[in-house]
């Protein structure tokens, strides 16, 4: 009742604001993108049903590949075509590469002291340059190779134990543990198998809360200037703050662990070690851009969101598609075992360059099941034209890479899992081919792309080399569906349980 009264009291303000906004956004000579009719105050919020990427895909099939929606007072353009994506992410990249400011992203980025959610500007450019040069360079990436391989060795050992017992394996949980172990070791120096302040279950809970926070809806985001009152009355502010507090406690524990007296830095320092060392050097050298603790936490936050669940859900999707497609499973396993031989004791990253059909399987998984089917929203910094339509300044822009990757104009039988489609194709997924953009493109391309690709490829190669896979007794392959769930990261809704059989 209190929320309803609040709405009624604020109704005149909403209507006046909406009138002013619509006049500002619709100069008579502008050609705005088409879209569904808006309702007073809420705009198109009533049109948002189901998962956002599938909802937008359905709407775009009716209103076109460049579509205008209004989330409350906020204009949002959804792009669902290769051509539109290329204009936004390449031709007009500079004008379209900022980020919208929301309550949740301000929290999780420590007031935009990160590279994932911070608006475009000098601070963002300086921080991104530092991260790419110091944390994601080739030498640093290679120095962590032993971690990626060790964690996969541990995975194979555990799966072998399950295989000997012929017991089903919960692949969602197993693959999450694999990726979380890799990311936590190389980024935070934390071994979740024997850490004092976090374990596998804690990390899973934190990742879920992280995604809950990023996807959190605040009225302030849709009704700038007046929505804060509804958030306060409804308790949404308190909810978001409580979730963020738990995440911040974990990040602070990571920092405290690194600065405690007597701690020995390993031969290969982790990401936090490197950033702490940079902070000390900047204090001495008097650099114009100075790292702060908030910058450090913001980067940790980015790694947590982009590094853990994305690769884990991709691996899970890969196993689901392969078990449902025995022809492809046999073809890729035959290639792997013929090429690498039948007597390897362990798989290394050097093996990845030898298996070509396997690479096509990974490419097809990235096409059908991008972990984040909607790229993180951008915001225009000036008036631009996309596909002939006028896009006003401060308009949010969403690229529906899921819709593009299933566009029948670009792909034959787009909903079918068929790696063979890439046999005579030069299409790649590293941001230069706009029909396939699992990591984005342009200035906002995922800086951790190489780590993500390698994590998926190495994990999947291990699973397919050492084991054959069957469904549990009493189950049928036809029982395995591809229903989706999630908000920012889209995963398989039902648990995938398979039985590993040791191949040799």
Curated annotation (Swiss-Prot):
Family stated for the protein in its record: Belongs to the cytochrome P450 family.
Name of the protein described by the UniProt record:
Cytochrome P450 71B7
The cross-link Glycyl lysine isopeptide (Lys-Gly) (interchain with G-Cter in ubiquitin) sits at: 82
Query: Source species, please?
Result: Arabidopsis thaliana
Q: Among its keywords, does the record have Metal-binding?
A: yes
Q: Which SUPFAM superfamilies match?
A: Cytochrome P450 (SSF48264)
PANTHER family from the xrefs? CYTOCHROME P450 71A9-LIKE ISOFORM X1, CYTOCHROME P450 FAMILY 71 PROTEIN
Q: In which tissues is it expressed?
A: Highly expressed in rosette leaves. Also expressed in roots, leaves, flowers, and siliques.
Report the main location listed first in the record: membrane
Which of this chain's residues are annotated to bind heme? 446
Entry-linked Gene3D superfamilies: Cytochrome P450
The enzyme's first-digit EC class, named in words, is oxidoreductase
User: Which Enzyme Commission number(s) are listed?
Assistant: 1.14.-.-
Q: Which domain of life is it from?
A: Eukaryota
Keywords carried by this UniProt record = Heme, Iron, Isopeptide bond, Membrane, Metal-binding, Monooxygenase, Oxidoreductase, Transmembrane, Transmembrane helix, Ubl conjugation
Instruction: Write the gene name.
Output: CYP71B7
Q: Does the keyword Heme apply?
A: yes
One GO cellular component assignment for this chain's record is: membrane
Name the CDD domains for this protein: CYP71-like
Cofactor section? heme
Provide the protein's localization: Membrane
Q: Which GO terms describe its molecular function?
A: heme binding; iron ion binding; monooxygenase activity; oxidoreductase activity, acting on paired donors, with incorporation or reduction of molecular oxygen
Positions of transmembrane segments: 1-21
Membrane topology (UniProt): Single-pass membrane protein
